[in-house]
Amino acid sequence: MAVDPAFLHALPKVELHLHIEGSLEPEMMVALAERNGLRLPYASVEAVRAAYDFQNLQDFLDLYYQGMAVLRTERDFEDLAMAYFQRAAAQNVLHAEIFFDPQGHTARGVALEAVIAGLTSARKRAEAELGVSSELILSFLRHLSEEEAFATLEEALPHRDQFIGVGLDSSEVGHPPAKFARVFARARAEGLRLVAHAGEEGPPDYVREALDLLAIDRLDHGNRALEDEALIERLIAEGMALTVCPLSNLKLRVVDDLGAHPLKAMLERGLKATINSDDPSYFGGYMLENMAAVAEALALETHHLRTLTANAIDASFASPARKAEMHARLAAVN
């Protein structure tokens, strides 16, 4: 039986895998370029949107880094994040854990302080004005060196109270988690939470490295773990949450169609899967669109969607009190 759209909308949502730079809508890209006196290689908003029709991860990343170049000032980052929070609140997202890529900004001469201050201002406003709580996760670009990641971490540590953890993203193949074992150990010593993208395009061994060498608290993507039975059993035994991104997987050809997506199989095996939007402006949908699309394609029922939300609450880095509050909101939905 199809899930009632009213239930889908009313369902409280928790997003654990959202790149704030990936929420840059074409309209905002054009507006920020104008505000900052920058020339885009596109004649219109429609031309930008047409460029969002890419075929693979690398083509997407090339466009993603080009797009983020319009982000220059503290106000730009605040506006970007507030636009995301407003969309999230409209879809009944209660809590979001947001990646940001400082190296993509500092390499362009943008001060790290401006990035963090703008995002933090938006987070405070979102909680006060919209009731959306959030955390920031500083993400290292894996195509760069570990030395550069160390430098970014050291530069960010004076702002330690503004971000809860570190992550690892960008081009996966050829950049295994092992490359960043020392910087993750340093982050762990600072009391930061640890997450990493692994097993999206990279092999199951990358997931194993993220567990063994990075000692992650949460696994981002993780789809290819399903190719390794021993790894599946380990993830279940350890209660490791996976931040799964269905529309992202479809757009980047990780799956050929959503009917072949492994999300339902993950749930049925007992994996702690969650639904997330990843880079929603590029991949065609925020939390509600991801849930609706995968619910239809995989014939999910309301109990599956409740489980996905409960998993996300449990796997979040929110306080115990906030988690209890969100579980109560979930239980109240009929």
Curated annotation (Swiss-Prot):
The active site is at residue 200. The keyword Manganese does not apply. Its EC number is 3.5.4.2. GO terms for molecular function: adenine deaminase activity; zinc ion binding. Pfam families: A_deaminase. Zn(2+) binds at residues 17, 19, 197, 278. Keywords: Hydrolase, Metal-binding, Nucleotide metabolism, Zinc. One of its GO terms (biological process) is adenine catabolic process. Binds 1 zinc ion per subunit. It catalyses: adenine + H2O + H(+) = hypoxanthine + NH4(+). It comes from the Bacteria. The record marks 221 as: Important for catalytic activity. Substrate binds at residue 279. CDD domains: ADA. SUPFAM superfamilies: Metallo-dependent hydrolases. Catalyzes the hydrolytic deamination of adenine to hypoxanthine. Plays an important role in the purine salvage pathway and in nitrogen catabolism. This is Adenine deaminase. It comes from Rhodospirillum rubrum (strain ATCC 11170 / ATH 1.1.1 / DSM 467 / LMG 4362 / NCIMB 8255 / S1).
